[in-house]
């Protein structure tokens, strides 16, 4: 053999080896995708393997009585609060942990340090809560309590333990704080043409949750959201006599604070499917200054984890009846300044609230409270039981999307009481998911499909937008503590990815009939309770009838990518009449059920469904196709329902 021939052979071998080395190996590993899944929280007698509260499930309770006053000159809220805490746990409790969320506004707060001023504007710094007195009731008498404040938390040492299994203690707190003037901690006040609007939330010291998984859950308030106990509230707000107060729950003294005309119009609204004006723009302009006179507005709310309210002399007010299942009703209301009036603006707010509450109640779980109130004010885009805060300049679809989303939070987390601080997707993602269908349904799709900052903000199909997120190596998984998710990923991951995952689960994995039954059962089982992610996963598997370990692992616990390809189409014996074999490959770790579309040269089409079991043993599948006309092309996921990262290999054209 000549040296020249040897050189040629060696060069050919080198080229072949290089080509082999450059061919990317398929990263798909079915043993990894379909491995047994250990969920974050184990099944116990308290939380069952079926995703329901178990026979031993317990939950503590906090009932509140609060008398508050607002000094509108100094912008200070002062209050006297009594908390009755019931310990249903199996543990005697020697101390209580209280949440002091107003301390977020202190310049030395952990939340301000973490946000670097991004969330909390330095101009809104305050002293936080000023605690004038903290006492514990013992033998019917108040006893000064020893307490320690740490950032947004306070530990109160008790003179005697609260006994397990139903023991009670009463805590009295007298306090005041300066109301922050800029949004950042999810509340604010601001001046407008007809008077200041105060959106008051996190306005009273609140019990932390003591649960079966962590005992006291004492994550500090870093400007994300909340985890709260359920109970009943009686609260009163004293304000200048020219102000209107709208709050969570039922107004118990309308005869003391409303005019006869306002009471009559409210009665009319309770019987009307059309919006009724309770206070007109002209009446706002004609309201005289109150002088030194004040009014006290009293509210009551049951089965709630929180209350919030708004107050202003400049509110236009309207309302309409909400028709609930079983012949029940509630009242949709909106309060907004005259500058927000308009048929393309806040004059339609009550219609949006009414429609959303009616549809969510019919589809998922009946709305439980007497009122659903939308507020135009400075604390834009925030939700509380029975009341939500939105932007005074919102209009048209922007106002619709934000109104439907915020009132949708009545179900998640106000009814289904998840831990927003640890598992934000369980309220934001699930709520965004139910918003998708409200956007499709309202006024025959007037504003649908849902496309906003929370869900599919770009021009591409939602699946194609999600595919880009899955390729981002820095994107966190959905199951991340809320405080660790950077702002860049908050909406894309916590809202959009979680919601889109649930649409996949409903429309492509379980189907609407199985999904809806399982989802309704989850809501009913966990209403006014505290589910964790594992409870949701188990509930959907048990009632939905599928082992979804592969889906939870790939979509929620990881940020796995998805890539299907049509690699080859070959006729049997070269004859279309004898059939064809289509080779499909799964080229990445995330598996999803898919549709394979056969397009014939006659113009006919045929769809073949590939379940996830297709990929249980291998990343390559040869799909047999019955004999028929000549095939023009074969496409996997032709309708862009799946987040396929590379669509260039989704279609195979048959020459």
Regions found by a protein language model. Give the residues of each.
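Hydrophobic helix-coil surface modules that form long, contiguous segments used
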Residues: 205-215, 222-404, 433, 445
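Solvent-exposed beta-hairpin/edge-strand motifs
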Residues: 93-140, 242-243, 599, 604-609
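Early extracytoplasmic/domain-onset interaction patches
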Residues: 23-99
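Short, hydrophobic/aromatic-enriched beta-strand segments in well-ordered soluble domains
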Residues: 81-83, 87, 98-102, 167-181, ...
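Hydrophobic alpha-helical and helix-loop surface patches within well-folded domains
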Residues: 2, 15, 27-41, 45-47, ...
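A surface-exposed beta-strand-loop module
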Residues: 23-28, 76, 86, 92, ...
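Glycine/proline-rich low-complexity spacer/linker segments in large multi-domain proteins
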Residues: 108-123, 176-229, 233, 254, ...
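Beta-strand-rich binding/interaction modules
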Residues: 246, 259, 562-565, 571-637
């Amino acid at each position: 053999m000549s040296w020249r021939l040897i050189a040629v052979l060696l060069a050919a071998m080198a080229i072949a080896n290089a080509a082999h080395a450059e061919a990317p190996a398929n990263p798909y590993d079915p043993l990894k995708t379909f491995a047994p899944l250990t969920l974050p929280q184990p099944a116990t007698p308290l939380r069952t393997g079926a995703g329901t509260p178990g026979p031993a499930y317990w939950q503590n309770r906090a009932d509140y009585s609060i008398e508050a006053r607002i000094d509108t000159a100094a912008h200070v809220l002062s209050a006297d609060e009594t908390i009755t805490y019931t310990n249903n746990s199996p543990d005697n409790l020697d101390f209580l942990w209280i949440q002091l969320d107003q301390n977020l506004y202190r310049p030395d707060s952990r939340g301000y340090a973490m946000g670097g001023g991004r969330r909390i504007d330095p101009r809104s710094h305050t002293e936080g809560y000023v605690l004038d007195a903290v006492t514990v009731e013992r033998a019917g008498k108040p006893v000064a309590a020893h307490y320690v404040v740490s950032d947004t938390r306070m530990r109160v040492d008790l003179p005697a333990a609260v006994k397990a299994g139903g023991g009670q203690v009463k805590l009295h707190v007298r306090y005041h704080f300066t109301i922050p003037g800029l949004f950042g901690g999810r509340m604010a006040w601001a001046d407008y043409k007809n008077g200041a609007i105060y959106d008051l939330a996190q306005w009273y010291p609140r019990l932390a949750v003591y649960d079966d998984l962590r005992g006291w859950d004492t994550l500090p308030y870093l400007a994300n959201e909340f985890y709260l106990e359920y109970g009943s509230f009686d609260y009163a707000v004293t304000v200048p006599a020219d102000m209107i107060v709208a709050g969570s729950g039922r107004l118990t003294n309308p005869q003391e604070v409303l005019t006869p005309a306002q009471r009559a119009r409210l009665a009319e609204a309770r019987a009307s499917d059309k919006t009724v004006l309770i206070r007109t723009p002209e009446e706002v302009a004609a309201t005289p200054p109150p002088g030194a006179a004040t009014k006290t507005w009293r509210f009551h709310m049951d089965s709630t984890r929180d209350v919030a309210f708004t107050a202003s002399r400049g509110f236009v007010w309207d309302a309409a009846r909400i028709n609930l299942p079983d012949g029940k009703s509630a009242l949709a209301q909106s309060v907004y300044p005259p500058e927000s009036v308009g048929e393309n603006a806040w004059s339609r707010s009550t219609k949006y609230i009414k429609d959303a509450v009616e549809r969510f109640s019919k589809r998922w779980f009946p709305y439980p409270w007497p009122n659903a109130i939308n507020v135009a004010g400075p604390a834009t885009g925030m939700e509380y039981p029975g009341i939500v805060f939105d932007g005074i300049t919102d209009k048209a679809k922007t106002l619709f999307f934000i109104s439907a989303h915020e009132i949708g939070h009545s179900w998640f987390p106000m009814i289904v009481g998840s831990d927003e601080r640890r598992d934000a997707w369980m309220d934001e993602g699930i709520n965004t998911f139910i918003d998708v269908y409200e956007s499709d349904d309202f006024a025959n799709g007037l504003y649908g499909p849902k496309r906003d900052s929370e869900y599919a903000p770009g021009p591409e199909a939602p699946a194609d937008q999600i595919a880009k997120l899955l390729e981002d190596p820095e994107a966190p998984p959905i199951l991340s503590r809320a405080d660790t998710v950077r702002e860049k990923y908050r909406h894309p991951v916590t809202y959009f990815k979680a919601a889109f995952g649930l649409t996949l689960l409903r429309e492509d994995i379980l189907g609407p009939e199985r999904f809806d039954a399982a989802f309704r059962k989850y809501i009913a089982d966990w209403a006014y309770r505290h589910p964790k992610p594992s409870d949701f996963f188990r509930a959907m598997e048990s009632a939905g009838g599928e082992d979804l370990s592969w889906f939870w692992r790939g979509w929620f616990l990881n940020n796995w990518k998805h890539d299907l390809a049509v690699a080859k189409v070959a006729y049997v014996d070269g004859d279309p009449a004898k059939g064809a074999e289509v080779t499909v490959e799964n080229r990445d770790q995330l598996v999803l059920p898919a549709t394979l579309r056969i397009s014939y040269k006659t113009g006919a089409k045929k769809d073949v469904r590939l379940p996830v079991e297709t990929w249980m043993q291998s990343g390559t599948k040869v799909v047999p196709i019955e004999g028929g006309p000549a095939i023009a092309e074969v496409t996997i996921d032709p309708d862009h329902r799946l987040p396929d990262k590379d669509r260039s290999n989704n279609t195979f054209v048959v020459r």
